């Protein structure tokens, strides 16, 4: 499985979320609401998540091996580094159940 397209919107914010991302896998499957987060060790890609009734955040979709996680990270960060346009954060909202949960879950 390969990342065949990355759509990224950098956002201007005081928070740790720096971009919203959608990826396409094998030109056949799209995953929305990935986020580029500024963590303690630098930027990383967070998977789409949903708040559970007890207030925890759970990934909706995520890679199940480190090779796929690294491929996603590399593809997203390449586009992030090449993107100059930044939009105001009020126009860059993830879907209503996804949130910047600040997780530091790096691969």
Swiss-Prot record:
It holds the Pfam family SpoVG. Keywords: Cell cycle, Cell division, Septation. Residues 82-107 are annotated as: Disordered. Residues 97-107 have a biased composition (Acidic residues). InterPro entries: SpoVG (IPR007170), SpoVG_sf (IPR036751). GO terms for biological process: division septum assembly; sporulation resulting in formation of a cellular spore. Disulfide bonds: none annotated. Belongs to the SpoVG family. Could be involved in septation. NCBIfam families: PRK13259.1. This is Putative septation protein SpoVG. It comes from Staphylococcus carnosus (strain TM300). The lineage of its organism: Bacteria, Bacillati, Bacillota, Bacilli, Bacillales.
